[in-house]
Amino acid sequence: MAVEGSTITSRIKNLLRSPSIKLRRSKAGNRREDLSSKVTLEKVLGITVSGGRGLACDPRSGLVAYPAGCVVVLFNPRKHKQHHILNSSRKTITALAFSPDGKYLVTGESGHMPAVRVWDVAEHSQVAELQEHKYGVACVAFSPSAKYIVSVGYQHDMIVNVWAWKKNIVVASNKVSSRVTAVSFSEDCSYFVTAGNRHIKFWYLDDSKTSKVNATVPLLGRSGLLGELRNNLFTDVACGRGKKADSTFCITSSGLLCEFSDRRLLDKWVELRNIDSFTTTVAHCISVSQDYIFCGCADGTVRLFNPSNLHFLSTLPRPHALGTDIASVTEASRLFSGVANARYPDTIALTFDPTNQWLSCVYNDHSIYVWDVRDPKKVGKVYSALYHSSCVWSVEVYPEVKDSNQACLPPSSFITCSSDNTIRLWNTESSGVHGSTLHRNILSSDLIKIIYVDGNTQALLDTELPGGDKADASLLDPRVGIRSVCVSPNGQHLASGDRMGTLRVHELQSLSEMLKVEAHDSEILCLEYSKPDTGLKLLASASRDRLIHVLDAGREYSLQQTLDEHSSSITAVKFAASDGQVRMISCGADKSIYFRTAQKSGDGVQFTRTHHVVRKTTLYDMDVEPSWKYTAIGCQDRNIRIFNISSGKQKKLFKGSQGEDGTLIKVQTDPSGIYIATSCSDKNLSIFDFSSGECVATMFGHSEIVTGMKFSNDCKHLISVSGDSCIFVWRLSSEMTISMRQRLAELRQRQRGGKQQGPSSPQRASGPNRHQAPSMLSPGPALSSDSDKEGEDEGTEEELPALPVLAKSTKKALASVPSPALPRSLSHWEMSRAQESVGFLDPAPAANPGPRRRGRWVQPGVELSVRSMLDLRQLETLAPSLQDPSQDSLAIIPSGPRKHGQEALETSLTSQNEKPPRPQASQPCSYPHIIRLLSQEEGVFAQDLEPAPIEDGIVYPEPSDNPTMDTSEFQVQAPARGTLGRVYPGSRSSEKHSPDSACSVDYSSSCLSSPEHPTEDSESTEPLSVDGISSDLEEPAEGDEEEEEEEGGMGPYGLQEGSPQTPDQEQFLKQHFETLASGAAPGAPVQVPERSESRSISSRFLLQVQTRPLREPSPSSSSLALMSRPAQVPQASGEQPRGNGANPPGAPPEVEPSSGNPSPQQAASVLLPRCRLNPDSSWAPKRVATASPFSGLQKAQSVHSLVPQERHEASLQAPSPGALLSREIEAQDGLGSLPPADGRPSRPHSYQNPTTSSMAKISRSISVGENLGLVAEPQAHAPIRVSPLSKLALPSRAHLVLDIPKPLPDRPTLAAFSPVTKGRAPGEAEKPGFPVGLGKAHSTTERWACLGEGTTPKPRTECQAHPGPSSPCAQQLPVSSLFQGPENLQPPPPEKTPNPMECTKPGAALSQDSEPAVSLEQCEQLVAELRGSVRQAVRLYHSVAGCKMPSAEQSRIAQLLRDTFSSVRQELEAVAGAVLSSPGSSPGAVGAEQTQALLEQYSELLLRAVERRMERKL
């Protein structure tokens, strides 16, 4: 049937082509074919069906076909066997259909210039291709004669093509005016029907004409007469079969099943929902056979109707409820028993197998069920599978545990995490998991357990799939989901980090959550446990907030250290042990690599930097090869760079991708260190030889970028996960597996040699130097920085495979090994040069850890064993293990409800209320219903034997469990007589003007015909295709890094109903990986999830860092412990639930950052309000001398994020006005203006300060030490970063006692004192809606205090205050004083100004005429504030002057107030004189005169009263 090269042109080209060209091309083709055949796709765990058009069934063999990314999965429900067709074009499969004989499969794809392809099902090869669409193929169908194929394009294409695929010509074509969702051929092949938005159209084929004409003819179409249903969205259509072959059935999104007659008239319809139910409001799909009509509806409902009269027959059982614990569903009663108030996924696709009477259903949580419907009253489940419904972010293989009795999961298990907010435990081996605590469930043969992170079931549904009940995008949190997972080396703990920055640890034995802490302010990109060979039990978490937290897993995950050298997102962090030292390596989007060495620090361990390497490209991922000698880093320029861990030098570089476009996203080495696998943003996977850099295999099949990869422990598989929600299990070639196992055997041989020459040690080591790591912690490693140009280092790199020195040193090292080593002692490079012939050894005994698991799940590789549940050895293992964990395992925290008083979390982490333990999934031991004898593999590489057929394994419900409904609940309705005749009288004029007519309606009218799904019909034409991703991933310039990251919601990972997978849907890379570099560039904020409170470790660390005058080493757990627990406050402070929005009630709207760099005066405004509102803090005198004007700028803090906090603090601390002012003055005294000791401003230390990474970028040639903050020259103040933390309400931070030094920043500015103008120029108008009554208790007094000193700062000028202990200017000016800028405040006479430097002069004040008009409201507010402030001043003076034995400080306060009163009186007299001496004025001036007179009169009365009372007391 092959038609490739069948045209005349191609035949001539083949004849004229020379044999040499043919030979060269065939060699290149063979090379490519050889690379792609090394690794084969064995299993797909995922489904990307987007509607009824994406699911098909072979009517003869029963094969079910569905898309999974760029792969078509051919599934046999009877044998549970998969076959795969890979789309070599790398375009997502959107629609497919079988030919009537089942030999061929037609597929449609998305993207630009998509193709309709015909595949040979048996050969899995392409036989024909048509490329006549532009923007995606919506649906395809074979004609019953298999002669024609109909394909319909997406809305922006709107082309209907009839293709004679064997001749490779389009015989008929036309356009449609509406979005088409489905197509169906009539049984006699005379017409086909398309359905869509307000669209049912019948297209007629004249076979006599199309067969005679070789050119394309117009396709004739007639619209269906919809009558009163013309405004509906028809989601699916199916032509009748058998006796109803002349009828056409379709469903609407509103839940109607309609029947059209052969005259295209709407004959009758029935409402799919019954009277008493509200769950089936939406219908998605339909499937029609001779006996049944199946309608897929919302909430997992499938209705069965009789096609002859549309009478209701029955309702199929619903699938699992959302949030079901599948490990507990081990019996049929658990599946078919309804759960009260449960929510079920929608049915989005149906296909019927008439031979077996099986109905396959796909639901919008990406699950698939096959139901046996031979008896509609007793429906049984044949097969089911549950998959991730959104992007899969990470995959981890369950480690090989030395003591198999301590293993929590069976061998070959792996763990994935996803944006659907679940962590899933998988095991694809054919043998059962009955030896573990988890039994096989009846819902999935591959899925062991689902860990639901929270109770939100909305994340389990794919909202991009069709459905009328789509969730509002504003209600969905775009950062929901688990971003990274990691399993502890002993297999007991599972750590996970979500996209909100929360770190969780689950205990795998009971699958209960044992720890939950808000560790970061942004998503956690990487988690890593240290190996036991390091002697440490550490967990490192790295985040987009550029911080690394190191937790001690052996001490209940207490915080050991926080590292902040990186200046951007950290993409990877790894532990290693080399040269007797424990190392930590991290890389990130700031193009830096840090090599750190562990040092003993009291009871814990601290990491200090030893090497710092900077490259010119973003570093996306890193892995350490098994010998821990070298680390491989995947870079943005598609290169893999190999670094020596001990020296930090680059040793090798090779290309990590076969393509010329894209970016390396992930790198992963195999267990032996021979191969390294890479994933590129062009969606391709490659495997390279680690020593030579030669590509040995390539793979493709994912429709989105691969976000994670792992080799299996048995060296037989590579598991890849992707943004398309699919998991691919790849089978490696036999020679690759042999080479890896041979390398592991050589390592075991060397390990045994080391054992004979050295005493054994309780420490388990895997290399000559690993066991020494705990005792060889460096007291102070030498610092180095490799920031030279990359070319120089690479030009002098050493060829590691050609170094015989390594082999010699290896032999010496082996001779001195004092403890047993793991089979990963030496790198492949060293082994390849050792020239030792070690054959493929027999597996080691069970006591020796090797690549083969030993214990209760042992699977012999040679002999054929028959195993069953009746085996005595298996029965013994069914009893729960009561043995204590091994000594090297992590301490297991009890999984019960945890209290706030646990020591570890008191000292380092914020205590959290933990959930009660989940019930164990294990059920009481019982014999299975079916005993299968499963044979094991014969040899290592024999294909898995197929499981036994399951005719008897269908799960049926109890008779009482089957829901029955009265047929009368579904009433068939028909249009009234004359209705259709009145609307459509049969004249052709009405048909010509039908909205569905392609001939009479303008092409652009389709934009008005899809109101129900506006987002589905929109499509961006921006060329962002991943195929040309190299242009999108160009390294940003330094200036570009200043741009703010705009990361929107999560990009769609599945297919979208009604719109193709065009470039706007392929922004996955740009949204989640390219933004790693731009998100945390200097001057741009790190995009942080919105929280009502910020309790994360990162926030507390950044808050504490603000108190450091110079950059110091990161705090240990003891130093951070002081800030870990906020003070207890009344519940009135109001913890707002997460997701309530950016602003708390009464909080100001967000202030947009200015385009220019904020001035230092604006920068100072971050510190002062915090200092003033913590007057009772114990100030640290040791830091007075090192204080600087900007040393208090805190990291990750916005200039306008303090406003809601300030109001919150003011509400918590509400003493009497006199006491409040006295406290403020005490705060002044503690914050007096002292310049730095050297007379120069110290460098600022805010969140955007130059980190080690950014300094290395600025100056690559200098050698940077650890104390980079000790710079003598004054540094330019870094611009204030408007962090998204500004969106948070910060009540918890308000109670932390800040260790801020006493000296106030020298010469504070007006912008520093106003809580309203943070982030704005002083004269900028206030945004409307801001509460103006903020801080009335302080504001006027503060202004009077400042006026008493005679300082009236102008915009962007500085005010010099007294350098003494009392600095009245260190108060805040009122809100009202900023309505028109500080010019409203009249300055005092020059002779009365006590400061040596005057900020303004009387003549500098603006005239009244040049000012905007003062409103009455403003004036009244000013008067009220003035009265309140004077009262407060008087009360304060009375309280101070009334003391019989005043202290020196009280005497100073009294003198200060007297001077202030005198100064204010003189000011008012001067103002009154100016007003009286002015000539006739305008009406506006008259109002000003009245105001001034009123103020003068009132002030004089108050002052006289004060003087009288003072005279009485004196």
From Swiss-Prot:
Modification Phosphoserine, positions: S1198
Composition-biased stretches (Polar residues): 905-925, 961-971, 1188-1200, 1245-1256
InterPro entries in alphabetical order: MABP1, WD40/YVTN_repeat-like_dom_sf, WD40_MABP1-WDR62_1st, WD40_MABP1-WDR62_2nd, WD40_repeat_dom_sf, WD40_rpt, WDR62-MABP1_CC
Alphabetic keyword roster: Acetylation, Cytoplasm, Cytoskeleton, Disease variant, Nephronophthisis, Nucleus, Phosphoprotein, Repeat, WD repeat
GO biological process: negative regulation of canonical NF-kappaB signal transduction; negative regulation of defense response to bacterium; negative regulation of interleukin-8 production; positive regulation of JNK cascade
Amino acid composition bias (Low complexity), ranges on this chain: 996-1011, 1113-1126
UniProt keyword annotation of Hydrolase present: no
Disease note: Nephronophthisis 20: A form of nephronophthisis, an autosomal recessive chronic tubulo-interstitial nephritis that progresses to end-stage renal failure. Some patients have cystic kidneys of normal size and no extrarenal manifestations, whereas others have enlarged renal size and severe extrarenal defects, including hypertrophic obstructive cardiomyopathy, aortic stenosis, pulmonary stenosis, patent ductus arteriosus, situs inversus, and periportal liver fibrosis. NPHP20 patients do not show extrarenal manifestations or evidence of a ciliopathy, such as situs inversus or polydactyly.
The protein's name in its UniProt record: Mitogen-activated protein kinase-binding protein 1
Tissue expr: Expressed in intestinal mucosa, where it is detected in epithelial cells, endothelial cells, smooth muscle cells and immune cells, such as lymphocytes. Expressed in kidney.
CC terms in the record's Gene Ontology section: cytoplasm; mitotic spindle pole; nucleolus; nucleoplasm
Domain text: The N-terminal WD40 domain is necessary for the interaction with NOD2 and down-regulation of NOD2 function.
WD repeats mapped onto the chain: 88-129, 132-173, 175-213, 276-315, 342-381, 387-436, 477-516, 519-561, 565-606, 614-653, 659-698, 701-740
Biased composition (Acidic residues): 789-800, 1032-1048
Functional description taken from the UniProt entry: Negative regulator of NOD2 function. It down-regulates NOD2-induced processes such as activation of NF-kappa-B signaling, IL8 secretion and antibacterial response. Involved in JNK signaling pathway.
Keyword Cytoplasm: yes
Top-level taxon of the source organism: Eukaryota
Localization annotation: Cytoplasm; Nucleus; Cytoplasm, Cytoskeleton, Spindle pole
Gene (UniProt): MAPKBP1
Record region (Disordered): 748-804, 880-925, 951-1256, 1299-1336
N-acetylalanine modifications at: A2
Lineage: Eukaryota, Metazoa, Chordata, Craniata, Vertebrata
Subunit structure as annotated in this protein's UniProt entry: Can form homodimers (via C-terminus). Interacts (via C-terminus) with WDR62 (via C-terminus). Interacts with MAPK9. Interacts (via N-terminus) with NOD2; the interaction is enhanced in presence of muramyl dipeptide (MDP). Interacts with MAPK10.
